[in-house]
Amino acid sequence: MITSGIQPRAKNMKKNQTKTNDNGLKSLENKWGKNVIAQGWTGVPNTLIERQQALGLSSLDVNILLILLKYWWDADSPPYPSKRVIGEMVGKEESTIRRCMAGLERKGFIQRTANYLSLGGQSSNTYKLDGLVLRLEQEAKALAELKETRKEEDARMRRGTPIPTTKGE
């Protein structure tokens, strides 16, 4: 069952182009209700959810990344929500959001670009998520290996074959 609303690209589609799947949208509506889905939804990689601890992400880090994902509509257009908006969504002061986002930047998950208005003053920053994508790709490989190891261990257990252990256990 497709729940992301997105199908793999067809042969005649460009590399980053995707096709909406009406069945996927119907599936989301069946789960959440039409009124909820009408307000929008965000695709979140399971790797971000499953490997957040391995990535060294706090709950607030993940919440902020989820908000950035909410505003990231196109791979070539970085999201640009204001710290005020992010703070309102997670119930934190702008100073807390600033510190957390600085940490995400230090860890290489996001890259902040300051934007300035033509008449002077600063506008909302844009946030490139290339670092997050790269780290999730790395973690996805680790997750796949972990799942394969578990699958092999489960098969051994079903056959009654002992699982090899390392010295010191």
List where the protein language model places each region.
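Short, cationic-aromatic polyanion-contact patches
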Residues: 82, 115-137
